[in-house]
Amino acid sequence: MRYKVVGPPGTGKTRRLLNEVQKYVDQGTQLNRIGYFAFTRKAAGEARDRFLKIKTELTKKDIKYFQTLHSLAFNRLGLKEENVMQDLNYKRIGETCGIQIKYASYETNNWNGIFSSDSEYLSLINLARVKQISVLEQLDLNEHLSKIERDKLDAIEKEINNYKKTYGLIDFTDMIQKFLDENDIPPLDVIFVDEAQDLSLIQ
């Protein structure tokens, strides 16, 4: 059964979700079988802290599934931060492909999988991946602002894939896909998703 709680900011949606968590606990559902997932690490932490203020006998270890989906995948896959593509890796790819990249990184502090870059090539490639369409399909949607060369776009995507394969690295989208492929999903009886409208298709 699936329910949606809809409302503008500040109307108590998170409080409502936490009240529902408490109802399941009162009915006998174990906390390690309840998942509460938020779009950002900050939002997940705030929800966890608010719940712990109510349930003072509990600790963070008791509600380990209050997190982002990327944190869940990262932990279940046993990854380390050095396994994940970083800003420097994308800059090196840019040097190989002849494009200047000042910054290109995921918001690792939030672990929400949001990718930002000053290169519209990289942004377009990442957008296509989270939408689960090809980069050329995304290009043909004409949602980009700058001029994008079709052949260069294809070459950059191939270089990213080759680079990751050569150095054994993954990005945040790979992380979710690998998690799904390995099917190492914790046995949860109920799942809450805060700000579900912000999730990508693959999430």
Regions found by a protein language model. Give the residues of each.
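Short beta->alpha junction loops/turns
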Residues: 10, 40, 180, 196-197
